[in-house]
From Swiss-Prot:
Its main location: mitochondrion. Keywords: Membrane, Mitochondrion, Mitochondrion outer membrane, Transmembrane, Transmembrane helix. It comes from Mus musculus (Mouse). The gene is Cox14. It comes from the Eukaryota. It is found in: Mitochondrion outer membrane. Along with COA3, core component of the MITRAC (mitochondrial translation regulation assembly intermediate of cytochrome c oxidase complex) complex. PANTHER family: CYTOCHROME C OXIDASE ASSEMBLY PROTEIN COX14. GO terms for biological process: mitochondrial cytochrome c oxidase assembly. This is Cytochrome c oxidase assembly protein COX14. Core component of the MITRAC (mitochondrial translation regulation assembly intermediate of cytochrome c oxidase complex) complex, that regulates cytochrome c oxidase assembly. Requires for coordination of the early steps of cytochrome c oxidase assembly with the synthesis of MT-CO1. One of its GO terms (cellular component) is mitochondrion. The keyword Membrane applies.
């Protein structure tokens, strides 16, 4: 039977590991969202350029 200190240590390590995983996952989600935003902005800019050039012709 583990002692109270061992149980507390296990709980702390489990909690710390879950917080670390959540932080990594949050960073991943943030970077994916930023990448998609930049891709969309680039596509919109390219579409605007194409519209300008087609209007000139």
């Amino acid at each position: 039977m583990p002692s109270a200190k061992q149980l507390a240590d296990i709980g702390y390590k489990t909690f710390s590991a879950s917080m670390m995983l959540l932080t990594v996952y949050g960073g991943y989600l943030c970077s994916v969202r930023a990448y998609r935003y930049l891709q969309l902005r680039s596509a919109r800019r390219q579409a605007a350029e194409e519209q300008k050039t087609s209007g000139v012709l």
